[in-house]
C-alpha cells in the first residue's frame, strides 16, 4: 500500500539531501576547519562557507515552494503532528522496547506519537536554523549577528541528533522498523504487514477506502 505519493517523496528527498549537506559543511566549520576544504567543498570546487550559504538558500526556497504548492499536505502534516491522544503516553512508554520487538502500542493517527514529537521539534529546529542562517548572511557583524550565530550553533546541536535518530529509524535497521524505508523509496509502497505494525489505524482506513478490484 502506498504511504507517500511521488510528490511527497521527491520533496522529502530534496529536503534531506540539502539538510545533510548543510550539516556536513556546518559541522566542518564548527570544528574550526574553515581554512581547509571539506570533501564536499573539494567535490564542488567551492569553499565550505560558500557551499553552506548556497545550499541554505536552496533549502529556504525549497521549503517556500513546498508550502505554496502543497498547502493541503502541509495542513495535514501540521494538524496530525499537533494532535495529542490519551493513549500517546502509553505508546511512548513502550517504544524503547518496541523498536526491537516490533510490538508497538496501538495508535490511531497518521503519524505515531514519536513521529509527531519529532515532527514538531525538528520543524521548529530547522526553521530556527534557516531563519538565523539567513540573518547571518544578510548581516555583517554586530551584536545581533553574534546572537544569531550563537542560536544557529545551538540549534545545530539540537537538530543533529534528531536527524541522526530519524535516519536510523527510517533506514529500517532496527528490528521493529524493518521494511519502513519503503514508505519513502522505491515507489513509496509498504508491505501491508509493516503498515499494520507501525500505523494500524491508517492501514485499516487505507484498506477500507481502497476501491474493489
Pin down the residues of each PLM region:
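Membrane-embedded alpha-helical bundles that constitute the cytochrome b-like, heme-associated redox core
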Residues: 1-213
Amino acid at each position: 500500500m502506498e504511504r507517500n505519493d511521488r510528490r511527497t517523496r521527491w520533496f522529502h528527498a530534496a529536503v534531506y539531501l540539502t539538510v545533510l549537506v548543510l550539516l556536513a559543511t556546518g559541522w566542518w566549520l564548527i570544528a574550526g576547519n574553515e581554512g581547509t576544504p571539506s570533501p564536499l567543498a573539494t567535490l564542488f570546487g567551492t569553499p565550505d562557507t560558500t557551499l553552506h550559504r548556497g545550499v541554505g538558500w536552496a533549502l529556504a526556497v525549497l521549503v517556500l515552494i513546498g508550502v505554496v504548492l502543497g498547502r493541503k499536505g502541509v495542513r495535514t502534516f501540521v494538524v496530525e503532528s499537533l494532535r495529542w491522544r490519551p493513549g500517546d503516553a502509553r505508546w511512548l512508554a513502550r517504544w524503547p522496547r518496541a523498536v526491537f520487538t516490533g510490538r508497538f502500542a496501538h495508535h490511531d493517527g497518521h503519524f505515531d506519537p514519536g513521529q509527531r514529537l519529532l515532527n514538531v521539534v525538528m520543524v521548529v529546529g530547522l526553521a530556527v536554523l534557516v531563519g538565523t542562517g539567513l540573518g547571518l548572511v544578510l548581516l555583517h557583524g554586530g551584536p545581533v549577528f553574534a546572537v544569531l550565530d550563537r542560536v544557529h550553533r545551538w540549534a545545530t546541536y539540537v537538530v543533529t541528533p534528531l536527524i541522526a535518530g530519524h535516519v536510523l529509524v527510517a533506514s529500517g535497521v532496527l528490528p521493529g522498523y524493518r521494511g519502513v524505508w519503503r514508505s519513502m523509496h522505491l515507489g513509496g509502497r509498504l508491505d501491508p504487514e509493516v503498515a499494520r505494525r507501525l500505523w494500524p489505524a491508517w492501514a485499516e482506513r487505507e484498506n477500507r477506502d481502497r476501491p474493489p478490484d
